[in-house]
């Protein structure tokens, strides 16, 4: 069935449609703090979850790394939704070359919109002039849905919005890289390289914009060998909007134990505090992000991240615990 021109034109501007629907859900006139396409969630713990946004980060440790995160949206508002992410990765060697593989799943719900993504990841790690250079690729399967039956619209026959649940899927690609030299780390990735258009039912479609992610961090040693100060920053942009996060955290590590805390600031968006550490072999971190505009400080979002590393024996004896170069 051919697409109707008015519907196609309106949904081609899906960012504006999504914003309007969210404003209906989160009270008319109140500004939402979600940014970019719904498919790209801005996690507060970007520095701890690099495999979530950069496939080159998989396989940095000989251990099996398992991570999970839950993020709530706009506390106190009905149908504000939440995001769940889970991922696992590991390293392996082929001759004298180092590689990494991983898999992850993302489930994001907000208002009438639902996004799911399943991804397989591969990375190649190469020593280079006293540093480590890595390149990664990620195959994504996207599933999008809009439940128009939940929309409270004045005009029920508005062709811009579906009247029932519609869904669709598409294949996508992500590429990434990182450069690590001693205390300095630079990372970059590009999401939605395939620029897919997801068909929702017979009369609607959802184009997906590409998103560029750039991150950096530097470990500052102090007079105490156990305490480290770590400034980091990240830029996310879909070339029509952007978000910058600037983070400062302090970290205390002793043997296999870790305690950290810090502050994050996203100009014109939010301020956040987080704290975490190692509990019974599991790394756990909690953060609260409060909006400095729009919804206000009280309607922020909570975020919890868990991580566990399981030693593997892939033909080599790994008797010593390995400290990952991941953004800890």
Where on the chain are the PLM-derived regions?
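Generic secretory/membrane-interface signal
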Residues: 1-2, 25, 186
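Residue-level detector of intrinsically disordered/flexible regions characterized by low predicted structural confidence
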Residues: 6-9, 33, 325
């Amino acid at each position: 069935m051919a697409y109707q021109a008015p519907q196609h034109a309106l949904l081609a501007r899906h960012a504006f449609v999504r914003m309007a629907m969210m404003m209906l859900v989160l009270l008319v006139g109140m500004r939402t703090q979600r940014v970019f396409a719904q498919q790209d969630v801005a996690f507060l713990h970007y520095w701890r979850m690099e495999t979530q946004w950069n496939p080159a980060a998989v396989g940095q440790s000989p251990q099996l790394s398992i991570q999970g995160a839950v993020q709530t949206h706009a506390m106190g508002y009905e149908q504000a939704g939440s995001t769940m992410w889970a991922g696992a990765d590991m390293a392996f060697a082929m001759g004298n070359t180092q590689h990494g593989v991983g898999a992850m799943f993302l489930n994001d719900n907000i208002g009438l919109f639902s996004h799911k993504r399943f991804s397989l990841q591969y990375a190649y790690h190469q020593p280079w002039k006293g540093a480590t250079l890595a390149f990664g690729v990620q195959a994504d399967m996207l599933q999008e849905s809009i439940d128009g039956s939940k929309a409270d619209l004045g005009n029920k026959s508005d062709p811009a919005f579906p009247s029932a649940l519609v869904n669709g899927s598409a294949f996508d690609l992500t590429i990434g890289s990182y450069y690590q030299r001693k205390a300095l780390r630079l990372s970059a990735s590009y999401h939605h390289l395939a620029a897919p258009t997801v068909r929702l039912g017979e009369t609607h479609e959802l184009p997906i914009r590409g998103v560029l992610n750039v991150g950096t961090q530097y470990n500052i040693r102090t007079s105490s060998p156990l305490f480290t100060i770590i400034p980091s920053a990240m830029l996310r942009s879909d070339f029509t909007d952007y978000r910058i996060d600037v983070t400062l955290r302090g970290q205390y590590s002793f043997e296999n134990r870790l305690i950290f805390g810090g502050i994050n600031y996203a100009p014109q968006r939010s301020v956040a505090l987080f704290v975490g550490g190692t509990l019974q072999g599991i790394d756990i971190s909690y953060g609260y992000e409060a909006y400095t505009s729009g919804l206000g400080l009280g309607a922020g979002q909570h975020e919890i991240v868990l991580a566990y590393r399981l030693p593997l024996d892939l033909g080599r004896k790994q008797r010593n615990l390995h400290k990952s170069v991941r953004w800890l």
